[in-house]
Amino acid sequence: MMVNIKFNFWIIVILSLFILPACKPEKLEIEVYTSDIQSVNEGEVIEVPLKVEFSMIGEDKNNELPKATDLAKKYLPEDSEFEITKGTFGNVMTIVTSIPMGTKKSLPNYLKENPRPLMLVVSDNKIILESTGSLKTLNSELKDINFMLSADLPAKSTIFRITSDSKKKVTVLATAVFSEKKPYLHFEKSIKRRKSVEVEFKGGDDSVYKEIPVQLELEL
């Protein structure tokens, strides 16, 4: 019995060595206005607000989060804001920034001049969150700091806030999401001008969004 207890104890210790440094996106919050979609369909690329939260369990003894911040700055707008605070189980890094939204035709040229790790691709009024080549490069650089550091998608929680500034009613559609803490297999909600709706995509191991990109559709 004592042998089993000691064995289990060392298993926990060994696992902890791998778990403690882990730092991956906990939450993404993205805000889109319906008029932005119309502008994108006309050929524009628009930077939309993005807020990201990372959590690091345990102490950051090697100052890995500040180092990760310096790397991330190369791939984000100059006015991006970074904050590192103490959480319940470790440090939390919050980034307030923006990512480009455009079509498959307009985004490549924009990204050449403005490297970003993420982008929103609009196709037939469907909004798809995708990673870019810059994210792959960033992740490679992060692993040089700590092999457990990563900014891979999907985040544990991705929240889209859709606000209507269109004269006509707009309908938001999504699959396997939460809204107002309620689960929906097929979500559909119409919003009037100056109204908004939040849709949350869960990114756990059993989530469909481990296999396909986070996406929703608007009927304008």
Predicted regions and their residues:
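Bacterial N-terminal signal peptides that target proteins for export
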Residues: 2-10
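Bacterial signal peptide processing site
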Residues: 24-26
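Envelope-exposed proteins and targeting segments
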Residues: 28-32, 48, 125, 156-158
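Post-signal peptide N-terminal segment of mature Sec-exported envelope proteins
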Residues: 31-52
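Post-signal-peptide N-terminal segment of Sec-exported extracytoplasmic proteins
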Residues: 45-71, 131-149
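Mature, soluble, non-transmembrane domains
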Residues: 75-220
